[in-house]
Swiss-Prot record:
Residues 402-780 are annotated as: C-terminal regulatory PFK domain 2. It comes from Equus caballus. The modification Phosphoserine is found at S133, S377, S667, S775. Mg(2+) binds at D119. Homo- and heterotetramers. Phosphofructokinase (PFK) enzyme functions as a tetramer composed of different combinations of 3 types of subunits, called PFKM (M), PFKL (L) and PFKP (P). The composition of the PFK tetramer differs according to the tissue type it is present in. The kinetic and regulatory properties of the tetrameric enzyme are dependent on the subunit composition, hence can vary across tissues. Interacts (via C-terminus) with HK1 (via N-terminal spermatogenic cell-specific region). This is ATP-dependent 6-phosphofructokinase, muscle type. Beta-D-fructose 2,6-bisphosphate binds at residues 471, 528-532, 566, 573-575, 629, 655, 661-664, 735. PANTHER family: ATP-DEPENDENT 6-PHOSPHOFRUCTOKINASE, MUSCLE TYPE (PTHR13697:SF59), PHOSPHOFRUCTOKINASE (PTHR13697).
Length: 780
């Protein structure tokens, strides 16, 4: 962005006014969006107004519409719900109510409206916009507004952000609040699992989501449930027999518990509701199992927003302001949404229409169509769930292949989930699956055993690495590794791990020249808290680490708020990769985040100190600074702490905190469980195909570059990339990819922390159309 363009961003909002409101059911992360809209609005020079109590506040006006300041959105990020209040509003549905709302906006000169809510709230906003000119002429006729006021406010711009825990809005992969709701559900499922195992019970859990089965589906994937009932795909007519057979099979395999997940809108093929109680009665009557029902209810809306929702809310809020300020009378009202990890703008009414089409398809019992309309992400979740839950492994192993799975590098939450799904999908395909303990070292020493179906039972929710993981690379022990590949007849290798898994893969490729035994297909599933594996935008375990850092920062900020005038300097992990520091900075509302990828000088440190000195003069008397562990060898955490302590004398005092290895622990978040499960399934499917492809003269021989890949999430899809091709994109000295997508989120961090920056202010999304997205551009 040139200096002039940047200057344009900072003056884009001058003379304009934006109102922000939250409507409909509340969702965690709405506050992050409100905070971003307010701060970016102020950054561009616009005036920003809070509308309290949703549309009701818009209709009632007066004290309900208040101007927001920079400080008024401080300490909001970590709060659940919506601070400015929300209400379901009857008045706004009537034209009379909308007339009053228009009057209130015109009087304040507000012509830009940012609505955060579900599909109902967004449809209401669009109606309001289409009637705007008629409403103004009515107000003018009635003498409530002058001709001048009418001309000044001659059109209304609207942008929507989807805040709903149900994730039922078409066109966006994740709505604000969905991830946090999954956190609440998984916390409960984990807690119930322990008591169910003690008593050998069956639990029926009912989750929210109205007519959308997303929460139920992802929960089932994330906890390895025995059965799930979702409205989009009712069970076959003989489901009662099938369910009971499935539950008793699980028990005979040695499981001590059964978990059944029910979406509140679940129905059978005839459209008759399936209730939790009816399922309980069925299980008790047919099988005599001790069965309990737990209806989760409004717990799912509560609690602290997850790191994902805070970042999502913040990114969407920034994009919303840009969309409003760039809008013209001819641009359609748009929704800012997420596709893969990219912000996109979609026409509001197209999204609403598709969302209505789903309801219509379900009412007409066209369930396949409803599934398709939900998008590719939903379909993928369903396919993987069906594979893992409903298909029995074949008894005979004729024509089977032998695949080995291992962990390499440092432990990361979600590794076990990846191993579980790899093992089970492998068994379903009729393969022999071996697990290797302690990484390449174990492969060399022959610490290898065969895994059966129940070997990996209950692994999804367990943190760390149950197979054991080491950073050792294979080169030194090619002899022993080759011998064991022959001894155990290993025909394919799935490596779950971090940067070492990738470099180990490269070494295996080089070793193929000397050792024929190494000519077997292998795939790397990136799993590391640092998120520094080339070929993937995300790695398994990073989301869990991010939430751990966030939780700690929240507690630290609370302590600082109590003591006043205190600045905390926190050191995060990540090696040379600044992903954790940047994303945690965004999610925890840090004043600065120092990273290796963005070199900084003593002058930058000085600017930050001066910035904090200014901040202490406002009502917000605390600071939070994050520092990546290897961002600079001389400006260490101690150095920065000493500098801040000296410069802040008499104005603020400083404290430091090194988070350390707690970032590698904890039980995996729903995102990591789900991501790992899907990656494992995808890797095993690829592996089966590759082995068949490389089968020649009774043995496996794979020596092409595409037989050694990294499986990664790239923008909107899961892709396999040959490790040799990724070599060019890697900075081996610092163990990071040369290009990293999240660096473009850095300016948002700075704007939200009130820095006057000369940088591109936004990742800039262009208006797209939803039909294109449905035809297969959604992420996997």
């Amino acid at each position: 962005m040139t200096h002039e363009e940047h200057h344009a961003a900072k003056t884009l909002g001058i003379g304009k006014a934006i109102a922000v409101l939250t409507s409909g059911g509340d969702a965690q992360g709405m506050n992050a969006a409100v905070r971003a809209v307010v701060r970016v609005g102020i950054f561009t020079g616009a005036r920003v107004f809070f509308v309290h109590e949703g549309y009701q506040g818009l209709v009632d006006g007066g004290d309900h519409i208040r101007e927001a300041t920079w400080e008024s959105v401080s300490m909001m990020l970590q709060l659940g719900g919506t601070v400015i209040g929300s209400a379901r509003c009857k008045d706004f549905r009537e034209r009379e109510g909308r007339l009053r709302a228009a009057h209130n906006l015109v009087k304040l000169g507000i012509t830009n409206l940012c609505v955060i809510g579900g599909d109902g709230s967004l449809t209401g906003a669009d109606t309001f916009r289409s009637e705007w000119s008629d409403l103004l002429s009515d107000l003018q006729k009635a003498g409530k507004i002058t001709a001048e006021e009418a001309t000044k406010s001659n059109y209304l711009n609207i942008v929507g952000l989807v805040g709903s825990i149900d994730n039922d809005f078409c066109g966006t992969d994740m709505t604000i609040g969905t991830d946090s709701a999954l956190h609440r559900i998984i916390e409960i499922v984990d807690a119930i699992t322990t008591t169910a195992q003690s008593h050998q019970r069956t639990f029926v859990l009912e989750v929210m989501g109205r007519h959308c089965g997303y929460l139920a589906l992802v929960t089932s994937l994330s906890c390895g449930a025995d059965w799930v009932f979702i409205p989009e795909c009712p069970p076959d007519d003989d489901w009662e027999d099938h369910l009971c057979r499935r539950l008793s099979e699980t028990r005979t395999r040695g499981s001590r518990l059964n978990i059944i997940i029910v979406a509140e809108g679940a129905i059978d093929r005839n459209g008759k509701p399936i209730t939790s109680e009816s399922i309980k009665d069925l299980v008790v009557k047919r099988l005599g199992y001790d069965t309990r029902v737990t209806v989760l209810g409004h717990v799912q809306r509560g609690g602290t927003p997850s790191a994902f929702d805070r970042i999502l809310g913040s990114r969407m809020g920034v994009e919303a302001v840009m969309a409003l300020l760039e809008a013209t009378p001819d641009t359609p009202a748009c929704v800012v949404s997420l596709s893969g990890n990219q912000a996109v703008r979609l026409p509001l009414m197209e999204c609403v229409q598709v969302t209505k089409d789903v309801t219509k398809a379900m009412a007409e019992r066209k369930f396949d169509e409803a599934m398709k309309l939900r998008g590719r992400s939903f379909m993928n979740n369903w396919e993987v769930y069906k594979l893992l839950a409903h298909i029995r492994p074949p008894v005979s192993k004729s024509g089977s292949h032998t695949v080995a799975v291992m962990n390499v590098g440092a432990p990361a939450a979600g590794m076990n989930a990846a191993v579980r799904s790899t093992v089970r999908i492998g068994l379903i395909q009729g393969n022999r699956v071996l697990v290797v303990h302690d990484g390449f070292e174990g492969l060399a020493k022959g610490r290898i055993e065969e895994a059966g179906w129940s070997y990996v039972g209950g692994w999804t929710g367990q943190g760390g690495s149950k197979l054991g993981t080491k950073r050792t690379l294979p080169r030194k022990s090619f002899e022993q590794i080759s011998a064991n590949i022959t001894k155990f007849n290993i025909q394919g290798l799935i490596i779950v791990g971090g940067f070492e898994a990738y470099t180990g893969g490269l070494e295996l490729m080089e070793g193929r020249k000397q050792y024929d035994e190494l000519c077997i297909p292998f795939v790397v599933i990136p799993a590391t808290v640092s998120n520094n594996v080339p070929g993937s935008d995300f790695s398994v375990g990073a989301d869990t680490a991010l939430n751990t850092i966030c939780m700690t920062c929240d507690r630290i900020k609370q302590s600082a708020a109590g003591t006043k005038r205190r600045v905390f300097i926190i050191e995060t992990m990540g090696g040379y990769c600044g992903y954790l520091a940047t994303m945690a900075g965004l999610a925890a509302g840090a004043d600065a985040a120092y990273i290796f990828e963005e070199p900084f000088t003593i002058r930058d440190l000085q600017v930050n100190v001066e910035h904090l000195v200014q901040k202490m003069k406002t009502t917000v008397k605390r600071g939070l600074v994050l520092r990546n562990e290897k961002c600079n060898e001389n400006y260490s955490t101690d150095f920065i702490f000493n500098l801040y302590s000296e410069e802040g004398k008499g104005i603020f005092d400083s404290r430091k905190n090194v988070l350390g290895h707690m970032q590698q622990g904890g039980s995996p978040t729903p995102f990591d469980r789900n991501f790992a499960t899907k990656m494992g399934a995808k890797a095993m499917n690829w592996m089966s195909g590759k082995i068949k492809e490389s089968y020649r003269n009774g043995r496996i021989f794979a020596n092409t570059p595409d037989s050694g890949c990294v499986l990664g999430m790239r923008k909107r899809a899961l892709v396999f990339q040959p490790v040799t091709e990724l070599k060019e994109q890697t900075d081996f000295e610092h163990r990071i990819p040369k290009e990293q997508w999240w660096l473009k989120l850095r300016p948002i961090l700075k704007i939200l922390a009130k820095y006057e920056i000369d940088l591109d202010t936004s990742e800039h999304a262009h208006l797209e159309h939803i039909s294109r997205k449905r035809s297969g551009e959604a992420p996997a």
